[in-house]
Design a protein with these regions (language model features):
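Alpha-to-beta junction loops
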Residues: 24-26
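Membrane-embedded transport module
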Residues: 1-8, 28-199
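Acidic, divalent-metal-coordinating active-site segment for phosphoryl/phosphodiester hydrolysis
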Residues: 13-22
C-alpha cells in the first residue's frame, strides 16, 4: 500500500482486524468471521467464497462504466441544448439576418421538457443498465483518483456539443425561411434525432 498499490485484505479473526482496517478494501468472512472482523471490513463475504470477490469486482467495474456512459451522454446532450438556446437568443439576429432582427428561441419550453423526458431519460436509462463489456476484467484497473469524465471524454463532449449545436441551428435557419413553426419543428426533430443517434 505504501508503494501506491490498491490493497485488499481478507481475514476472519480478531487478529486480522487491524490489517483489514488499514487496507483499501477490507474483506471479512461472513460465516466463520468474528463480529470484530465483520465490523471493521468494507465488504463481508456471506458465503466465505473467495470467488465472490472476483464477481464483486466485475460488478463494480460494470456499474462504474455504466455511470460514466450515463454522465457522458447527459453532459454532451444537455450542453448542446444550452448552447443552442444561448446562441440563438444572443446572436440570432447575426445568425439569421433574414429573420428581421427578431429575438427567438429555436425550441419552445414544452419541446425542451419533452426532450429532457424522452430523448434524455430513456437512452440514459438504457446506458445505465447495460450488461458491460465482455472483456471488462481484462482491462487494467483505473487509477483511484481518475475523474469520472477524463480528458478524452471531455474532448468528445466538446466535439459532440459543437456538432449537435451546429446541425440544430442550421436546421432551424432552414425552417425559418418558411415560418417560425416549421423552424421550431425542424430544430426539435433534428436535436431529438441527434441525441438518439448519439446514444
Amino acid at each position: 500500500r505504501f508503494n501506491g498499490e490498491v490493497v485488499a485484505m481478507t481475514g476472519d479473526g480478531v487478529n486480522d482486524a487491524p490489517a483489514i482496517k488499514l487496507a483499501d478494501i477490507g474483506v471479512a468472512m461472513g460465516i466463520t468471521g468474528t463480529d470484530v472482523a465483520k465490523d471493521t471490513a468494507d465488504m463481508v463475504l456471506t458465503d466465505d467464497n473467495y470467488a465472490s470477490i472476483v464477481a464483486a469486482v466485475e460488478q463494480g467495474r460494470i456499474i462504474y462504466s455504466n455511470i460514466r456512459k450515463f454522465v457522458y451522454y447527459l453532459i454532451s446532450c444537455n450542453l448542446a441544448e444550452i448552447m443552442i438556446i444561448f446562441l440563438a437568443t444572443a446572436f440570432g439576429r447575426y445568425l439569421y439576418p433574414f429573420a428581421a432582427g427578431e429575438v427567438f428561441s429555436p425550441l419552445a419550453p414544452i419541446q425542451l421538457l419533452l426532450l429532457n423526458l424522452v430523448t434524455d431519460g430513456a437512452p440514459a436509462l438504457a446506458l445505465g443498465t447495460e450488461k458491460g463489456d465482455p472483456d471488462i476484467m481484462q482491462q487494467k484497473p483505473r487509477p483511484p483518483k481518475e475523474p469520472i469524465i477524463n480528458r478524452f471524454m471531455m474532448n468528445g463532449v466538446l466535439i459532440q456539443t459543437v456538432a449537435i449545436t451546429f446541425i440544430t441551428l442550421f436546421a432551424f435557419g432552414v425552417g425559418l425561411k418558411h415560418d417560425r413553426l416549421m423552424a421550431e419543428t425542424m430544430a426539435f426533430i433534428t436535436l431529438a434525432s441527434s441525441e438518439l443517434l448519439r446514444a
